[in-house]
C-alpha cells in the first residue's frame, strides 16, 4: 500500500517572482525552510497568514507538516494549523502567532517555518459501542507524570 518512490522529486511552482524556493540548511535537516513572499507586521497576541507564493504537489501517501523554526520559537512566534493535504495545490500559507510581548516584523524573504514531509495512512473508521480496555484507560493530561 505504501509503494512510494522516495527518489522522486517533489514538484513545486513559484506563483510570483516574490516566491523563494524551499531550502534545507544542512544535508540532514528534517524540514525545508519556507520563506515569506511579503512584509507583515504581527502585534503581540495576534496572528497573521503569511503567504509563500509557493504551491506544490505532495508525494503520494504523504502530507506536509508545517513546523515552527526554533529561532522564531525563542522569540515567542508559533505556528497555527500546519497541515498540507496530499491533494492541496494552492498557495502555501503559514499562520504565525505572536505570543511575545513585542510587535514582530516579517520581511520578504524571511524564513518563517519548515515543511516536513510525513507519511500518512487513510484508515477506514468503524463505530463501535466500546473500546478494548488498557492499563491507562481514560487517564489523560498529565496522568503519566513528569519523570
UniProtKB/Swiss-Prot annotation:
> Could you tell me the keywords of this UniProt record?
Early protein, Hydrolase, Magnesium, Metal-binding, Nucleotide metabolism
Query: From what superkingdom does this record's organism come?
Result: Viruses
Tell me its cofactors: Mg(2+)
Q: Which reaction does it catalyse?
A: dUTP + H2O = dUMP + diphosphate + H(+)
The positions annotated for binding dUTP are: 68-70, 82-85, 88, 93, 95, 111
Q: Where does Mg(2+) bind?
A: 24
| GO MF annotation list | dUTP diphosphatase activity; magnesium ion binding
Could you tell me which InterPro entries the record lists for this protein?
Answer: dUTPase (IPR008181), dUTPase-like (IPR029054), dUTPase-like_sf (IPR036157), dUTPase_trimeric (IPR033704)
Leader sequence segment: none
Picking any one GO biological process from the record gives:
dUMP biosynthetic process
Write down the EC number. Answer: 3.6.1.23
Q: Summarize the record's induction comment.
A: Expressed in the early phase of the viral replicative cycle.
Give the family per the record: Belongs to the dUTPase family.
Q: What does this protein do?
A: This enzyme is involved in nucleotide metabolism: it produces dUMP, the immediate precursor of thymidine nucleotides and it decreases the intracellular concentration of dUTP so that uracil cannot be incorporated into DNA.
Task: Spell out the protein name for this chain.
Answer: Deoxyuridine 5'-triphosphate nucleotidohydrolase
Amino acid at each position: 500500500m505504501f509503494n512510494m518512490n522516495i527518489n522522486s522529486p517533489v514538484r513545486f511552482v513559484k506563483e510570483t517572482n516574490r516566491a523563494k524556493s524551499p531550502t534545507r540548511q544542512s544535508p540532514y535537516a528534517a524540514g525545508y525552510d519556507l520563506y515569506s513572499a511579503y512584509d507583515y507586521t504581527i502585534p503581540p497576541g495576534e496572528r497573521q497568514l503569511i503567504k509563500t507564493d509557493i504551491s506544490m504537489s505532495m508525494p503520494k501517501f504523504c502530507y506536509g507538516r508545517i513546523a515552527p523554526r526554533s529561532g522564531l520559537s525563542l522569540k515567542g512566534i508559533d505556528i497555527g494549523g500546519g497541515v498540507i493535504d496530499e491533494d492541496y495545490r494552492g498557495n502555501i500559507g503559514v499562520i504565525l502567532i505572536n505570543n511575545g510581548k513585542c510587535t514582530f516584523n516579517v520581511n520578504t524573504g524571511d524564513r518563517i517555518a519548515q515543511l516536513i514531509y510525513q507519511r500518512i495512512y487513510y484508515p477506514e473508521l468503524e463505530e463501535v459501542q466500546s473500546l478494548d480496555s488498557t492499563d491507562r484507560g481514560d487517564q489523560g493530561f498529565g496522568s503519566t507524570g513528569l519523570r
